[in-house]
Amino acid sequence: ADIGNPKKFNKELEKKYNIQLNDLLSVRSFLDHNRIFEMPNIKNFDLDKITTKSTSAFCTNDTNKIFEPIIFKLSLIEHFQKWKPFISKYGLILLELHTINPKKCSLNIGKTLATAYDATHGFSNQYIIEYEDFIDSATIAGLKNNQAFEYNFPNDKLTTVSINLFSL
């Protein structure tokens, strides 16, 4: 199923297996940053209230146009909003990949795999964003991060891989 289209995924589950997506605990590993990019509807957001400190910039396959980091944060917010109706019962566990600020990376050589992640993902149209923006995007979308089930690797200061349990 297309991770970016939970409505269609739910319909397929109903048709094939007579089960609702909301009746399952949704668990995903490294899929959300690899979803098909959709340009966010910027008019739906108050850009004075949603910010990013991200230094990342990405382009998409169809246009090769470079977009500012805020575009990818807004796209992630919309992605999370699409999933809200389908995670209200049991929640959503995400194992996800993140980038970190290049300055922070340069001060921690050998302590993170951020450079390798950024290079491989940057050339394959996968949009990894900083952990702080990831959590903020989920919060803005109306998801709650259960910190009792939160894990950051290699640590809280250099998070390049996270595990989170989100609920409504």
Q: What is each stretch, according to the model?
A:
Residues S75-F86, G122-N146:
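Short alpha-helix
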Residues A1-R28:
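S-adenosyl-L-methionine
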Residues K111-H121, Y127-D133, A148-P154:
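Extended alpha-helical interface modules used as scaffolds for assembling large macromolecular complexes
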